A protein has these predicted regions:
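Mature catalytic domains of secreted/periplasmic carbohydrate-active enzymes
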Residues: 1-194
């Protein structure tokens, strides 16, 4: 069972040290605007940032077109796990680790914990599940990375001006949006760990 104690005792496995090369994947809704980086969802709500200016010029103001509005545009039409893994293997990768959920709060897997996931919205596919099955089928090691911990503050810029982050009907997606220096609640920390 996962706990802070069990996590502190975890030792890096030998296979990981021996592998030397693997693929770490950042891919999600933030790829739709394709501007800046995977931190676009945060930066588009930071008044004055390049992403903020780009967003308004390209999509309109954040109270009319927010980050959530990219989800239907994220279709993953060219996502082909078999081809991806074959390419990774050809490159010499021994393991594949996608980000299951980035700081944006959008899960790339089928889950009942949140409606904001790739199976129920956007591509309507269990991206992580499909990739995991193919990685294992082709004999590589599969792992996951969760970046949910920073969701605590990630979209807090949207609380400082008229944006959709302020709309209560999206609280379950935009998250707590606290200040970075605020102490995370034990409930939030356990939510991230588990």
């Amino acid at each position: 069972k996962a706990s802070w104690e069990s996590l502190s005792k975890y030792k890096t496995p030998d296979w990981f040290r021996d592998a030397k090369f693997g693929i770490f994947i950042h891919w999600g809704v933030y790829s739709v605007p394709g501007f800046g980086s995977e931190w676009y969802p945060r930066q588009m709500y930071q008044v004055g940032s390049d992403e903020y200016k780009h967003h308004i010029a390209t999509y309109g103001p954040q109270n009319k077109f927010g980050y959530k509005d990219f989800i239907p545009m994220f279709k993953a039409e060219k996502f082909d796990p078999q081809a991806w893994v074959a390419l990774f293997k050809k490159a010499g990768a021994k393991y594949v680790v996608p980000v299951a959920e980035h700081h944006d709060g959008f899960a790339m897997y089928k889950t009942s914990l949140s409606k904001w996931n790739a199976f129920d919205m956007g591509p309507h596919r269990d991206v992580v599940g499909e990739l995991a099955a193919e990685v294992k089928k082709q004999g590589l090691v599969f792992g996951l990375s969760s970046h949910r911990i920073e969701h605590w503050f990630f979209l807090n810029g949207g609380k400082k001006f008229d944006s959709d982050v302020l709309d209560p009907k999206y609280n379950d997606f935009y998250g707590p949006a606290h200040e970075e220096n605020e102490t995370m609640s034990p409930e939030y920390m356990n939510d991230w760990l588990m």
